[in-house]
Amino acid sequence: MADAPLQGARAVVTGGGSGIGLAVARRLQALGAELVLLGRDAAKLGRAQRELGAADAIACDVGDAGDVARAFAKLHERPLHVLVNNAGVARSAKLVDTTDQVWDEMLRVNLSGVFHCARAALPLLVAAPFGRIVSVASTAGLIGYPHVAAYCAAKHGVVGLTRALALEYARTSVTVNAVCPGYVDTPMTQETIGALAHATRRDRTEARAMLERRNPQRRLVAADEVADAVAWLCLPASQSITGQAISVSGGEVM
């Protein structure tokens, strides 16, 4: 394959069945990587696997430590070079209306999920010629937003974990980075638009425009733009880039 810097590398993408995760999977495959998709939704995983052809797929809830351990136990026969932590969920509510269940879900999936997968993957990544961990955080991991305190707390945690792991593994071939998108044109953002429209009694077009106005470019970020940033950090040539939280937000966060 021409221009395939990830030829022979194997990459795990969590939440790889749709949205940013699927865009990342496509991009890594185009660069030559062999894919393993993890996700909770078997139907989405199946559709992604059929589209991508050669990809493996494992049903896995990243928020469940046992589930993650079982999934990664299937990967020990061959080297692993890349882990992309993309699986995530978002719920919105004022803090006083945030239930314990919502708080726990936000931390369990968005933060503990990254911890579980990184812990399981690191022995394999260290043993490979090069290793990459890239976590899809959010601009909510860099600044605060109203009505998503639990989500912000989790994503700030992802950025902190990224920086700590980058230092912990600085003397190995493993780099650890985060990509922090603004609002991305994905099914999850469409759910956010619907919730915003309901909460503000606006139609969906007006609600979408509210999100677009947060971006100085006055648009939603494309999933492929996030995927390109992730893919760049996964390259063997990106060895000197570690501990970074890179905003992909049209200038919303600088």
Question: Language model features by range: what are they?
Answer:
Residues 170, 175, 241-243:
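Short, small/polar-rich loop/turn modules that mediate ligand/substrate recognition or access, typified
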